Amino acid sequence: MSTTSSSGIERTLRGCRPADVDPVVIDAADLDSTAPDHLRDLKQGLAARGYQPAAVATEAAFDAEGTLERQREADRLRGLVRAASFLGAGRIEVAVEDEPSEEARTALAALAERADREGVEFVRVDGAA
């Protein structure tokens, strides 16, 4: 749950001005790494070219039967939430094919909570991205 009041957001917005940057959505498959050094270089390179990451987009693959595979996928998605936050992206878009299992829904709910703690909006997109 956000601790920033609506009036605080409005007050901040009143002082905003346009920036000469283009928002971009980064496809997670295009990230070579989510290591901080790589993300720092990527963020600097994008800024130098006039781009600001607005979102990181990915597909969730929870179709595996085994607990270990589901845990690996949850770990990968958590890493992408951290990457989105590090890059300054305001949201992570997660495409989910079909109706996820109960375990996948639990993992997605935990991911949404993590995103909230990291200051990133979690957006679930139904179907393949």
Predicted segments, located by residue:
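N-terminal pre-domain/capping segments
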Residues: 1-71, 75, 116
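Active-site acidic/histidine proton-transfer and metal-coordination neighborhood
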Residues: 65-129
